[in-house]
């Protein structure tokens, strides 16, 4: 795969998205960060501010997302809604999805990042999660998570990848991102 053809889709937020962007930049990978007016982000390379019509294209029912992820979202949470809409763009544009976070007992991923993982499942896209608490990569097989053995981390095989995850990035999560880019590019 020619890295000049590759694009990382992310959101530019502090934590995992910042680390994905930094790794992409170090490896000469183009970067697109989806955001919205007024959103606090730290990565501005490849910034794509979505307008109200574009955000509406990625709109999802907070009730549906809440049921899917066993969580409650209030309908009057415009910032949460916009964040979920930008995550829709990240996953929709990526052919392969990489997430840094925590897989919960119900199989969902904790936090807003979880919507990205669930949407990737719905879209049947290759999905890999680095669970910081378990210090391991997991790959979604269509029905459950398969734990990857140490030394068998995923390798990007598509030119359009999505990198997202927790704001609370731990050193092992950062290393997982760096190692992913080293293996892939």
What are these regions (language model features)?
Residues 2-185:
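Acidic/glycine-enriched connector segments
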């Amino acid at each position: 795969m020619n890295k000049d053809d590759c694009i990382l889709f992310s959101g530019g937020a502090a934590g995992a998205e910042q680390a994905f962007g930094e790794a992409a930049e170090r490896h000469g990978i183009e970067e697109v960060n989806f955001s919205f007016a007024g959103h606090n982000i730290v990565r501005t390379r490849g910034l794509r501010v979505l307008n109200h019509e574009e955000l509406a294209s990625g709109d999802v029912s907070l009730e549906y997302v809440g049921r899917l992820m066993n969580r409650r979202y209030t309908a009057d949470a415009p910032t949460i809604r916009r964040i979920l809409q930008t995550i829709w763009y990240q996953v929709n544009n990526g052919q392969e999805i990489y997430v840094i976070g925590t897989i919960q007992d119900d199989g969902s991923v904790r936090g807003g990042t979880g919507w990205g993982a669930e949407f990737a499942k719905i879209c049947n896209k290759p999905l890999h999660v680095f669970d910081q608490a378990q210090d391991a990569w997991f790959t979604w097989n269509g029905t459950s998570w398969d734990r990857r053995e140490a030394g068998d981390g995923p390798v990007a095989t598509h030119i359009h990848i999505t990198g997202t995850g927790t704001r609370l990035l731990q050193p092992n999560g950062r290393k997982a991102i760096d190692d992913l880019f080293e293996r892939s590019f």
